[in-house]
């Protein structure tokens, strides 16, 4: 029961902090990045129907100040992905499905001793860039992340 009350307080405090952020200027994109309710909801929920594990939420809540700091100081992004997704939109008082391009940018850094990735999202050509997610230190094993050549001199294991 005590863990639940601590979780509730942490979530409430984080939500207040997140809401008070509003937007921050990003040198990497040379524009403001907005911290909308969609981004906070994505920290709590994986999708519309499933909540993230509590331990994952707590870690993301605690890393949020680092994510904001990273957006403020990073001058480059390391990842980019563009997809097309369907969204429900209102058109002449009716709900219709509309396909829009969705762009994701990943800013990766070790900041204050923690490796994190901040994901910025933009929907459509006219959408505003907004915070989408924070990914704590992770392990990659996807094909696109395979290292084909090294740019490092020497052996990092031995040096």
Set out the residue ranges of the language-model regions.
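Ribonuclease/tRNase effector modules and their secretory precursors
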Residues: 1-159
């Amino acid at each position: 029961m005590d863990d639940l009350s601590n979780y509730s307080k942490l979530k409430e405090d984080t939500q207040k902090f997140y809401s008070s952020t509003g937007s921050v200027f990003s040198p990497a994109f040379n524009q403001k990045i907005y911290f909308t309710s969609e981004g906070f909801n994505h920290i709590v929920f994986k999708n519309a129907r499933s909540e993230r594990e509590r331990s994952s939420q707590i870690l993301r809540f605690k890393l949020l100040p680092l994510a904001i700091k990273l957006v403020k100081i990073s001058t480059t992004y390391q990842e980019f992905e563009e997809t097309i997704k369907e969204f429900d939109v209102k058109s002449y008082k009716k709900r219709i499905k509309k396909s829009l391009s969705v762009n994701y940018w990943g800013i990766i850094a070790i900041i204050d001793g923690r490796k994190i990735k901040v994901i910025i999202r933009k929907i459509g050509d006219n959408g505003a860039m907004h915070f989408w997610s924070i990914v704590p230190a992770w392990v990659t094993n996807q094909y696109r992340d395979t290292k084909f050549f090294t740019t490092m001199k020497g052996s990092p294991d031995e040096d």
